[in-house]
Amino acid sequence: MVDNEAGTRQAIQHLYELGHRRIAFIKGPKILVDSVQRWRGIETFAQAVGLKVDAKLVLEIKGRNSTYAEGCQLTEELLRRCPDFTALLAFDDLTACAAIRTMTKAGRLVPRDCSVVGFDDVPSSAFYNPPLTTVHQSLELQGSLSAEMVEELIRASAEKRTLPPKHRKVSPKLVVRESTCEAPHS
């Protein structure tokens, strides 16, 4: 399993180091463990540096999964509520892509007017316009670790042994591309 908290801490730290203080968030659905963990990473970092998270700049995906359409709708809502945010951290790359498209249609240029960060590093994120800064989680490594654990369980079962519960976390990595830059100066 990817260390979601570490991933969002890296993402918000990147925005913070670029001078962003008015950061909008599109959270994942509450029912997903990933969403809870990612939000915890944001809160932990914000508390550590004294960054105020404005409740008006926090929206949540309502369905079980993110959709491009909902990403657009939530970004439109953020722009209506509080258009002065300088950065947006999205639950995933699909939502980030929708946010970029919506902001561009509204006349806000990414990253000049608003930096955007996603999460997952799906293959197409490098080809978005602009290429998306995102948190990479290695699905290959997660898959191979899962396969190793299954093999261990099979061997243990064949040998009539029990194994203690095991929990492995895969470290994510922030991939900085062209959707982020220094916060605009007012």
Language-model regions, residue ranges each:
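Hinge/beta->alpha junction and helix N-cap segments in small-molecule ligand-binding domains
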Residues: 1-10, 26-74, 89-97, 119-121, ...
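Alpha-helical recognition/docking segments in bacterial nutrient-uptake
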Residues: 1-13, 17, 79-80, 84
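Residues that mark the start of a beta-strand
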Residues: 20-22, 86-87
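Short acidic capping loops at alpha-helix termini that bridge into adjacent secondary structure
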Residues: 21-22, 53-57, 110-115
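Flexible loop/turn connectors
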Residues: 74-185
